[in-house]
Amino acid sequence: MFKPGKTYDAIVVGTGAAGGWAAKELSEKGMEILVLEAGKQLNPAKDFTNHAQPYNMKYRGFDRPGERELTYPNQWTASEYSKQLYIKDAEHPYITPKGKPFRWVRSRFVGGKLLHWGRNARRMNDFHFRAADHDGYGENWPIRYAEMAPYYDKVESFVGVASEKVNLPHWPDGKYLPPMALNCGEKIIQKIAPKVGMRVATKRAAMRTKSIHGLGKCHYCGACGNGCDAGAFWN
């Protein structure tokens, strides 16, 4: 909590993926941090609907006719289940250059879009860092994968990323929790893929398949975009 007259070592603006991690690292080094967030703290028990069924929703999950167009037209991943995790476009308008529309998905809450993100946690590789060498466009990054690897290790160990090692240069392996179990359709694809020269691997998902650091694990309810009251993915 902000204390008038107190001197802070650093101010972090925003509590999403970047701001939240910056505050964690700086405070763990003994620094006094002030974190500024434009939104409120949500209550998972009240604001998350990952276990809600259509009959729990007033409009069976489809929302009141015309509500999306009037209130949150740019929040394309929002629904009657999850609109409380997003801003209302009508209250926070913005403009874009003519002929260059942009749909800006925003969440003004503690945690930001980490409350409902896609949890895709792939590592970049040297094809990314040296892209200009391959396609001649732009500039290469001033860093290489080998320099980033230890930091990927640190983040994955803390966050909890479920996947499997595949030993592919364009898809670097990391420190993983057990992979998410495949469903029936995925198992069929995994079986036939080698026959056409392909292979199937599980997504690198920041989803805990077992409990670490005293946090929850996934129980496969499937409605991750509506917030996770089990605390099974990083936010």
Predicted regions and their residues:
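N-terminal Rossmann-like FAD-binding beta1-loop-alpha1 element of flavoenzymes
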Residues: 10-35
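Acidic, Ser/Thr-rich peripheral helices and adjacent loops at domain boundaries
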Residues: 48-64
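Glycine-rich FAD pyrophosphate-binding loop
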Residues: 27-49
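A short, basic/flexible loop-to-alpha-helix module at the beginning of a structural domain
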Residues: 1-7
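Glycine-rich, histidine-containing beta strand-loop boundary motifs that form or position
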Residues: 15, 37-40, 44, 119, ...
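Flexible, glycine-rich phosphate/dinucleotide-binding loops
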Residues: 19, 42, 209
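Conserved redox-cofactor binding core of oxidoreductases
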Residues: 59-62, 66-88, 93-103, 108-109, ...
